[in-house]
Amino acid sequence: TTGAQNTLIGALAGDALTDADYNTAIGYAALSSDTLGSQNTAVGYLALLTQNFTSGTTSYNTAVGSQAGRLLTTGIHNTLIGGLAGDALTDADSNTAIGYNALTTNTLGSAVTAVGSGALALHNVTSAAQTFNTAVGYDAGNQVTTGVQNTLVGGLAGDAITTGGENEAFGYKALSANTTGFYNVALGSRALANM
């Protein structure tokens, strides 16, 4: 290897790195497929397992937790913290997932923020589009599949939304019955919960 200033701890951690710099991989098979990606941090069992840049890209991915970012291959600027956080991401950019199972099924959607256990757990778009969804709270927006530009803050806020978009829900279970609606604003505990 000709890389510089890499820290690799654990069986198979950073195993394929050749000409990559400034990576940290700690845990079994963390960052083990990458050859040329630089400035990544993978901490935990299988964290950033399949990331593989072949062009020497500076990717700035951070994955901390068992299987966090496990399937990420070429995405950049992702922060994934928690067990299974961003587990299915493949070629997605600029995502933040913090919490167990946060943003766990998203493959291509970019510019998504999910904070809380199960937040945006089912989010998954079929193109590499920026969806601008934000969910903060336990299971907030956990059913959103292809909906875009939703802001959901509070435990279970917008938890039934699937394809709806441009909704704003603030408070426990706010907008929790809406599945496909657009342009709704719910403010307060259980606001528009039966809509």
Language model regions located:
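Glycine- and small/polar-enriched repetitive beta-structure motifs of secreted/surface proteins
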Residues: 1-195
